[in-house]
């Protein structure tokens, strides 16, 4: 299932590593350093013209780092609700 992150960006729920609120997480120096390093590597993509509220870390096999970070104007609470609004696929056991 795909989750709309804002603007015209949607990602597969399986590729989302984490959804983080910028107001609370950027209080940590480690988070600020992580985002700064990702920005330098070109792994940060802003998908908003407004002040971002959330950053979303996703797997991206096309990038050298293996991940991409989206900055979104949609709150982390809303994105989390969207991610759980669809049922998770059941694992099917092989009948051998």
Task: Label each region the model flagged.
Residues 1-96:
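Eukaryotic intrinsically disordered, low-complexity regulatory linkers and tails enriched in Ser/Thr/Pro
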